[in-house]
């Protein structure tokens, strides 16, 4: 008996949980695991092509609107590390512990948490409801540089991945609510709704700071020109876009009435229209099932095993361990598609015997395919605010102006820094129900310029199993600045110095640079040297994980997928979510993931009649 067949027999005969009763009536053309921006549109598109589809979602169908908060009914609470060095991990000022009473406590690594509190790490929320993280994100809709799509085209040798074709895909899915119909590069009849607030009168300190930025870019500084820039379209069609510094408005995935649009809306519309889409909520996928027969000596996926029940995953704050769920199976006539997201997709692959051999053997998981790239190559946009203290009257809150600029550390000549700003300090994420009453709060006059690094060079992050139990959360470490440090941290340091000079040059308002702190005072270029580097090391955060099941070249041992989303070494199994990107697309990957999903829909519809064992 061959190696694959031995592993298949073992997987079919055993389970971490128990052997389920097979229900052959639970058979569909396709099974999609995950309802976020990758899986939700794909499942809907396949159903609209009249294929029967089962869409499995581990969360329920709770909603929250536009609040940007992370209530437990729609959020999984992941806690991650940034470094392998615990000393650097403890430099962060917003770490999380769990007290003996089961409550979160947030503080700096140098603080003293309550006695007996368990250290958790850096808070990293993910959406866990129908719609996935498109239900909890900030809705920023910023198209990636063309080079990110062309990179995939070059890797795969498939020109349909190129920027020109991917822009056509964007035009097809977009339903633009803020531009005149017919505007080049945009769509007006799709399902993916976009909108942008029009700026009104601009008060201080925004006006004075934006005027200083405009002057720095040699742009007009009068209020009318500033207002016009803040209402301009950042996703305009222009071959020079990715090299152009300037000021724009912020498009979001929102409806014409300002409400959040998410993949949930498209799923609901598909079901309401009576297409053959079955949505199963509170359904935690535990492993992929495989046929007893192989395709050309490769395992063939033919179903999913899952637990049905509420709050079964340990990242759910409501998890108690008292509910074991009901073990179920479902089968696919054609294919299984995993869209669980950057953390959970590699976890499910590994639980199914697909991943680094040494990890699987550690937890006695039979190895179907030794795919070393599963769970590796994880990337994120580095983020951090530069905070000022404004003297005098201010108009507070989040404001519209978005800056894209090129630093001397750009790896390819393209813009490498995205900046949003306003009377707030966006220092990252921590549970809103935390119990540390002494946690420092920002007072009146706080102003922040928040960095999001474009084209980050670090690809050393990872997701690893901690157990063969599918309810257990994996180990997650972003390994920040492990590679490409000179480029990534260099751009961050440059932007800090630049922002200090912008604050000093603000028109009609006094703004004192406050954070990162610079005890000795900045030099003539605005830099504080090693102090800035130490602050960046401690306070960098992110919330755009990608690339843990990446598309790659044939022959690359780290490539998990081919250019048609197929898991290498397996038949009938694909991955369609942000984990598939070989490098992080732009500064906010949500719109790119919707586009990826549409691309996958094209591929699957085109291959639906093919013999799965022939290709």
Where are the model-predicted features located?
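N-terminal redox-cofactor-binding region of secreted/periplasmic oxidoreductases
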Residues: 2-615
């Amino acid at each position: 008996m061959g190696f694959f067949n031995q592993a298949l027999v073992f997987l079919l005969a055993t389970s971490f949980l128990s052997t389920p009763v097979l229900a052959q009536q639970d058979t569909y053309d396709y099974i999609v695991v995950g309802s976020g921006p990758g899986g939700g549109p794909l499942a809907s598109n396949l159903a609209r092509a009249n294929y029967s589809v089962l869409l499995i979602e581990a969360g329920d169908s709770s909603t929250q609107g536009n609040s940007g908060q992370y209530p437990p009914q729609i959020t999984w609470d992941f806690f991650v590390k940034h470094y392998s060095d615990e000393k650097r991990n403890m430099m962060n000022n917003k770490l999380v512990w769990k007290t003996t009473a089961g409550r979160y406590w947030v503080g700096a690594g140098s603080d003293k948490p309550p006695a007996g509190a368990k250290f958790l790490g850096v808070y990293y929320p993910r959406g866990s409801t129908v719609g996935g993280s498109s239900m909890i994100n900030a809705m920023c809709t910023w198209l990636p540089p063309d080079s990110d799509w062309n990179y995939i085209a070059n890797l795969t040798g498939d020109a349909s991945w190129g920027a020109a074709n991917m822009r056509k895909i964007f035009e097809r899915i977009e339903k633009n609510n803020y531009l005149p119909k017919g505007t080049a590069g945009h769509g007006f009849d799709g399902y993916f709704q976009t909108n942008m607030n029009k700026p009104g009168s601009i008060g201080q300190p925004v006006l004075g700071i934006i005027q200083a930025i405009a002057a720095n870019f040699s742009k007009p500084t009068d209020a009318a020109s500033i207002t016009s820039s803040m209402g301009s379209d950042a996703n305009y069609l222009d071959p020079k876009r990715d090299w152009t510094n300037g000021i724009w408005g912020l498009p979001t995935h929102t409806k014409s009435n300002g409400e959040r649009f998410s993949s949930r809306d498209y799923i609901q519309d598909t079901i309401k229209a009576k297409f053959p889409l079955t949505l199963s909520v509170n359904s935690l996928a535990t492993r992929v099932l495989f046929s007893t027969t192989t395709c050309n000596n490769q395992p063939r996926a033919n179903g999913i095993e899952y637990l049905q029940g509420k709050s079964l995953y340990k990242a759910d704050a409501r998890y108690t361990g008292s509910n074991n769920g009901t073990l179920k199976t479902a089968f696919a006539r054609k294919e299984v598609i995993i869209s669980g997201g950057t953390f959970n997709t590699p976890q499910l692959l590994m639980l199914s015997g697909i991943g680094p051999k040494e990890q699987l053997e550690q937890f006695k998981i039979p190895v179907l395919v030794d795919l070393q790239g599963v769970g590796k190559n994880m990337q994120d946009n580095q983020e951090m605010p530069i905070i000022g203290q404004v003297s005098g009257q201010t108009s507070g809150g989040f404001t519209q102006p978005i800056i894209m600029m090129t630093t001397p550390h750009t790896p390819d000549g393209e813009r490498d820094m995205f900046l949003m700003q306003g009377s707030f300090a966006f220092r990252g994420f921590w549970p809103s129900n935390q119990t540390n009453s002494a946690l420092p709060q920002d007072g009146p006059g706080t102003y922040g310029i928040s960095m999001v690094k474009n084209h980050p060079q670090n690809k050393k992050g990872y997701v690893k199993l901690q157990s063969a139990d599918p309810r257990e959360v994996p180990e997650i470490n972003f390994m920040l600045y492990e590679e490409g440090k000179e480029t990534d941290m260099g751009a961050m340091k440059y932007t800090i110095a630049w922002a200090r000079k912008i604050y000093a040059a603000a028109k009609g308002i006094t703004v004192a640079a406050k954070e990162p702190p610079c005890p000795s005072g900045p030099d003539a270029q605005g830099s504080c040297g090693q102090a800035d580097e130490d602050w960046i090391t401690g306070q960098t955060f992110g919330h755009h994980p990608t690339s843990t099941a990446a598309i790659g070249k044939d022959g690359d041992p780290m490539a998990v997928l081919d250019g048609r989303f197929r898991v290498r070494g397996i038949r009938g199994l694909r991955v369609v979510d942000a984990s598939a990107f070989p490098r992080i697309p732009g500064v906010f990957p949500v719109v790119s993931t919707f586009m990826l999903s549409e691309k996958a829909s094209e591929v699957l519809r085109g291959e639906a009649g093919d013999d799965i064992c022939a290709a």
